[in-house]
């Protein structure tokens, strides 16, 4: 399973069985710094075209004074074409990233973080965008929305220690 966190920055994790992939240098799953647009927007890492520069939460919330909830309420109301177009473009870039993750890992991708908490209402539209990019399958049901809408990383960290504790009880 790949978890893609769409919050103040973009990050993620890859669970393989009961193990989290961290990589050789502890930087595994730095999805926010995958290049999705060569020579694109400047990222806070001083490179250009990183996913973070296209899909962090502030890309959307900046349209509504930093209020992500207000952004999604406006999109839901359907009256502000500028916001609807901005969200459509956001989903286009996100679809590229999710497609790339699917091609690399061939597993489910969970959308989480601040933006992931709002994706339930838009998941079918988003799945359609992602499926258009995939040459092997049209079914994009592998894209999931997080169950925990807030504090997902805290829950994930706790689960690791709870699992470890339960295993120690069995020894």
Roles of regions detected by a PLM:
Residues 47, 51-171:
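ATP-binding/phosphotransfer module of carbohydrate and carboxylate kinases, centering on a glycine-rich
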Residues 1-46, 162-171:
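Phosphate-binding/catalytic loop of phosphoryl-transfer enzymes
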């Amino acid at each position: 399973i790949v978890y893609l966190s769409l919050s103040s920055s973009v990050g993620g994790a890859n669970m393989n069985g009961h193990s989290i992939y961290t990589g050789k240098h502890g930087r595994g799953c730095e999805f926010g710094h995958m290049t999705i647009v060569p020579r694109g927007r400047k990222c806070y890492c001083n490179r250009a075209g990183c996913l973070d520069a296209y899909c962090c939460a502030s890309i959307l919330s900046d349209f509504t004074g930093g209020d992500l909830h207000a952004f999604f309420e406006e999109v839901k109301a359907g009256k502000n074409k500028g916001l609807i177009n901005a969200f459509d473009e956001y989903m286009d870039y996100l679809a590229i990233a999710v497609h790339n993750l699917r091609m690399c890992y061939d597993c489910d991708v969970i959308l989480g973080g601040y933006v992931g908490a709002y994706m339930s209402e838009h998941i079918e539209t988003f799945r359609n965008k992602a499926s258009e990019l995939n040459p092997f399958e049209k079914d994009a049901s592998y894209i999931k929305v997080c169950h925990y809408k807030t504090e997902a990383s805290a829950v994930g960290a706790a689960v690791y220690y709870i699992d470890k504790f339960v295993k120690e009880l069995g020894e």
